[in-house]
Amino acid sequence: MATNFFIQPITQEAEAYYPPSVITNKRKDLGVDVYCCSDLVLQPGLNIVRLHIKVACEHMGKKCGFKIMARSSMCTHERLLILANGIGLIDPGYVGELMLKIINLGDTPVQIWAKECLVQLVAQGDHVPDHINILKRNQIFPLFAPTPRGEGRFGSTGEAGIMRT
């Protein structure tokens, strides 16, 4: 059965880069590139970057988690950018906007242009996605229905792991 990503723009800016469509992953790429939806400048040190999208992943008909990983273009001889946590792990129950913590290791600000791809999404279990489904901005979609995990951001579950008594 299929592995699918569902991407929903949540701002007008994002709608321009994510028009409603279904994209078949003919090349069988493991990662799904994610656009920056506006020009931005990353100052030296820690930066928070809004991606203006919600994302859900489904494998074999069941919602699953996914990873946010840096693309090789994120760190080049012109710029030294890294994800603050190395790899972002998104819980299956998270239904909020995707955001990044990016560290600019350089001494000068770095310009990022709209439509530049710094990160990619990889399904839990490293399953190759069959389709990337781009939804309408205000479309009601079951995989984005409220969950106990909700829309809280970075480390917001407030619990240390899953082992509880």
From Swiss-Prot:
Query: TM spans, by residue?
Result: none
Q: Name one GO cellular component term.
A: host cell cytoplasm
Q: What induces it?
A: Expressed in the early phase of the viral replicative cycle.
Q: Which domain of life is it from?
A: Viruses
Q: Which InterPro entries match?
A: dUTPase-like, dUTPase-like_sf, dUTPase_trimeric
> What single Pfam family name could you report for this chain, choosing any that match?
dUTPase
A GO term for molecular function = metal ion binding
Enzyme nomenclature, EC number: 3.6.1.23
Keywords per UniProt: Early protein, Host cytoplasm, Hydrolase, Magnesium, Metal-binding, Nucleotide metabolism, Virion
GO BP terms: namely: nucleotide metabolic process
Needed co-factor(s) = Mg(2+)
Q: Which reactions are catalysed by this chain? A: dUTP + H2O = dUMP + diphosphate + H(+)
| Function field | The viral dUTPase may play a role in lowering the dUTP concentration in natural infections to minimize misincorporation of deoxyuridine into the viral DNA and ensure the fidelity of genome replication.
Q: How does it assemble?
A: Homotrimer.
Family named by the database record: Belongs to the dUTPase family.
The name of this protein is Deoxyuridine 5'-triphosphate nucleotidohydrolase
